């Protein structure tokens, strides 16, 4: 009997160092350097193993913002990935946020194949690799890379104007027969998540096609040995029938691990499926060059941008969503001043800390880690009312206590989908889902 180990990280978002950079010289058990150390320590027990990145590696952290601001190149990020010797990866939706030339340059620099079978540029796959086969002893491992098809709903049109996005389900259905003919082991590497509960099959979200994981498992699990997922930042390690299912969280806080065993008759089975915690280790060190790079990054983050008239610190994010707060008022006011729009709304991310009086680059990036631009839209009153009522569904009230609705907590927290509104709007009762709005004039209004 022989074993093959598969180690997976996903949604690292450029968090290389063991810190989220909320403060200088902070240390946390996270990041690609420490996650890779965990992998290298564990893989010693196996003769054969794979190291996999499941996408969203190029954007979403202070380090990624630093690279685009200072050099316009991902070379320093690529250097980390190349020296860690990944075997293959796939594309995430955030890979497109800096534009197609930046992504293509990154792909040229990486020393491992990035697989994506369902995104096309003209008549060929964007990465020139959709499926790849690896020979491991007498076994052939076939891997297909897939990415959520929902990218056009988020991305700036000029970043993806030459691309076509296909359903991951449909492309997998197309490729599987050929993969079965050529491979003994089939691995699906999907930067997308699950639209239904894995046990009950009950939908956990509106079925838009953004996440097709459950549909693929339900239809094809008998042909898939390992089903790798991401995008939702969930931590999943379980079996769907005989298929190992992995989703290893985000920012390098956990590592997905699957071990397949092959018996003397070449029958393949799942030996184990688990998440390895990324924890501090006395043998883990950061070399001098990496420490120097981190210092440069910390200095850039501490650059003072401006001084405000008063403190806008957020001590409790939920309270800032329930009642007017100087930070969200400031942001919405700035949007209106810049755009000339009639109405503005913004969201608070989980990392939001507001602004101290002296605002640094660190403060800006901690509040909005993804450098997205605001959007100006023309909408009807009916659509605006519908959007406000959707925001109202964020809240639940029991015994006169306001809390967050379970719909925004399961299967993953979605606080970023609650919009905080500004200007003459409507005031919506938050007691029950489906409550309608009544006219309400208040420049500090909440939905």
Predicted regions mapped to residue ranges:
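Amphipathic, soluble alpha/beta structural segments
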Residues: 126-134, 190-196, 267-285, 302, ...
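Context-gated lysine
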Residues: 51, 104, 132, 180, ...
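A short C-terminal boundary segment appended to hydrolase-like catalytic domains
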Residues: 262-360, 367
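Short, solvent-exposed loop/turn motifs
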Residues: 140, 316-319, 432-433
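Generic alpha-helical secondary structure signal
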Residues: 33, 75, 101, 170, ...
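Generic preference for well-ordered secondary structure
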Residues: 87, 91, 156, 229, ...
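Acidic, metal/ion-coordinating pockets
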Residues: 1-282, 322-334, 344
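Feature captures C-terminal
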Residues: 3-5, 15, 28-30, 34, ...
């Amino acid at each position: 009997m022989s074993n093959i180990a598969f180690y997976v990280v996903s949604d690292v978002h450029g968090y290389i160092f063991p810190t989220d950079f909320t403060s200088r010289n902070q240390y946390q058990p996270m990041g690609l350097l420490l996650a890779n150390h965990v992998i290298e320590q564990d893989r010693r027990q196996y003769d054969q193993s794979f190291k996999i990145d499941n996408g969203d590696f190029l954007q979403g952290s202070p380090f990624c913002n630093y690279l685009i601001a200072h050099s316009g190149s991902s070379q320093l990020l690529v250097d980390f990935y190349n020296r860690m010797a990944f075997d293959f990866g796939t594309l995430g939706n955030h890979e497109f946020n800096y534009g197609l030339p930046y992504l293509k340059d990154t792909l040229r620099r990486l020393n491992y194949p990035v697989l994506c079978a369902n995104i096309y540029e003209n008549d060929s796959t964007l990465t020139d690799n959709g499926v790849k086969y690896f020979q491991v002893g007498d076994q052939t491992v076939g891997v297909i890379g897939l990415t959520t098809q929902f990218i056009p709903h988020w991305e700036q049109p000029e970043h993806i104007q030459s691309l076509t996005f296909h359903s991951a389900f449909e492309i997998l259905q197309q490729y599987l027969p050929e993969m079965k003919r050529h491979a003994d082991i089939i691995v699906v590497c999907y930067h997308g998540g699950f639209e239904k509960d894995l046990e009950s099959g009950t939908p956990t979200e509106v079925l838009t096609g953004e996440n097709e994981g459950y549909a693929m498992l339900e239809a094809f699990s008998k042909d898939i040995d390992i089903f790798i997922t991401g995008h939702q930042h969930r931590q999943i390690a379980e079996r769907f029938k005989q298929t190992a299912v992995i989703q290893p969280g985000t920012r390098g806080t956990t590592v997905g691990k699957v071990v397949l065993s092959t018996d003397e008759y070449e029958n393949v089975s799942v030996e184990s499926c688990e998440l390895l915690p990324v924890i501090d280790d006395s043998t883990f060190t950061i070399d001098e060059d990496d420490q120097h790079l981190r210092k440069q990054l910390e200095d850039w983050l501490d650059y003072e941008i401006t001084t405000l008239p008063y403190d806008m610190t957020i001590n409790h994010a939920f309270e800032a969503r329930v009642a007017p707060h100087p930070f969200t008022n400031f942001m919405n006011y700035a949007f209106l001043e810049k755009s000339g729009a009639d109405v503005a709304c913004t969201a608070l991310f989980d990392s939001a800390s507001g602004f101290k009086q002296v605002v640094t680059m660190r403060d800006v990036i901690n509040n909005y880690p993804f450098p997205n631009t605001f959007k100006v839209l023309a909408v009807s009153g009916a659509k605006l009312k519908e959007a406000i009522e959707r925001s109202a569904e964020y809240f639940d009230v029991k015994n006169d206590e306001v809390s967050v609705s379970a719909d925004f907590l399961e299967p993953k927290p979605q606080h970023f989908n609650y919009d905080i509104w500004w200007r003459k709007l409507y005031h919506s009762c938050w007691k029950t889902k489906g409550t309608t709005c009544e006219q309400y004039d208040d420049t500090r209004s909440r939905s």
